[in-house]
Amino acid sequence: MNYLSNYTVEEKAVLCITRSADINPDDEIYESTDDYRTHMKKVIKMRARLKPVRLEIEGNRHKEIKKYLSERLNISEQDIFKSQAPLDLKYVYKLTDKVSKEERKNGCYRPFVPALNRDFIPGVSVTKQILEEDKLLSFPFDSMDTFIELLKESAKDKETLSIKITIYRLARQARIVKYLCEAAENGKEVLVLMELRARFDEENNINYSEILEEAGCKVMYGMEDYKVHSKVCLITKKNSRGIYYITQIGTGNYNEKTSRLYTDLSLMTANVDIALEAAEVFQALSMGETVEETDHLLVAPHCLQNKVIHMIDREIEHAKAGEPAYIGLKMNSLTDKKIMEKLIKASKAGVKIDMVIRGICCLIPGVKGETDNIQVRSIVGRYLEHSRIYIFGTKGREKVYIASADFMTRNTLRRVEVAVPIYNTDIKMQLIEMFITMLSDNVKAREEDHNGNYKIPKNQDTPLNSQEFFYKQAYLNAKNVNS
C-alpha cells in the first residue's frame, strides 16, 4: 500500500535513530516474585524504549525537517548528523559473494585458520600435557579447540570432580556450553557464573543460563555491585594420589567466534597455588563476596590496583638506586588516575616505560620533565588487539602477568577481574618477546607524541606487521608439529 499516493514527494531521506543502551538493572523496580534472570528479561525489553541519543540522516538536508525531528524525538539539533555513507552496513558481509576470486585475492586478506599450538602433541590427552608443563594459547594464531578439548576430556573423565567457570560473552553456537552440560549430566559438579549484564549479550547469556540449568549445572548471575569480567576456569580432579587441578585464566572471553578475530592469551596450568586462589575466587563469588587478599593472583576490586602500584613503586626504588628499571604494559585502555599518577612518578625517577594501548590513553607521553621516559603505541590491524600483558622489572627479575583487566577505574575498582602470574620461564620469555615484537611494529602501529597525536613510527627500515609476524610464526610451528 502506498500511503503517499495523494502527496507529491519533494525530498526523501533515510533515518537512523540510536537509542541509549545504558540499562542498569539495579535502578529498576525489582519484583519480589521475580528471579534475577526474569528481572533481566524485563529490563532488556526496556532498551527499545530508551531515550534517543543520536539521529543520522542520509539524503534530505532540509532545515525544517531537522527541526521537526528534533522536537518530536526530543533530541538536540547538535545530536543530529548528516551522513554521506549508507546508514546500514550489514550488506557488506554479503559483498564477498559478488567479488571474483581474482579480486578477492588482490583486495582481501588471505584466509587464516588458527593452528594447533606448537606445545601440544596431536592425539595426546590435553589434560596430561598440561599436567606435565604450563601451556599458553595465543589467539587467533592458536586454535581455541585445544581448550574446548580440555573441557570435553574433563566432562567424560571419571577423575573429574568439578568444573567451575566465569562466563562474560559466548558465541551464538557455543561448544563450551555443550561440554559443560555433558559434564553435569555425567554427574560432575558444574558451577557457572554467568554475567547477565554483559552489554548487548544479555539475551544470549540468559538463553544459555537456562540451557545450563536444565542440564543440571548450578548457575549464578554475578554480583549486585560488581560485574564479573574475569576469565577463569577451575577443573578439580581426584585420583589414587589425591586431589589435583587444572586452571585456565585468560584475557578474553570464551567466545569461539571472537577467538578468531581478537588477539587474546590463555594460560593453562596445574600449579596448585594458582588453583587454590582461583578456588577462593569462586568461593567468594558463591557467597556474594569478593576476594580481599591474595599471594599469587591479582584480583580486582580489592587486590589488583594496589598490587600494581606496589610493583611500580618497586621499579621506582630500583631506578633511584641506579639500577635498570622497566615497566611494559599491553592493554585496551588506560584511564585509572592512581595508576597514571604512579607511572608519571616512575618516569620522573628514570623508569623506562613502554605501553601498547589500542584505545583510550589518558596519559600523554614525552612531556618534558614529566613523562620523558614513557612511550605509548597503538596497534590497529586485521585482528582486534584485546590481550593484556603486565611486565614489571628487567634483567632476569621480570614479573609477568596476563589479565582480563585494563587499567580503567571501572576494571580496577568496579569489576571482578583476575590477573595471573607467569611462573613458567619459557612462557614468560615468549610473552616478553611478543611484547618486543609489538614495540617494533612499524606497519600497523602508531606512536603517540607529547601533543596527544598519533603518528607513523620513525623506524621504517624493515617493515614489520606484528600480527602478520605472529600468524606466520604459528603456521610454521604447526607445520613443524605435524611433520
Describe the predicted segments one by one.
Residues K352-V356:
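Hydrophobic alpha/beta core scaffold segments
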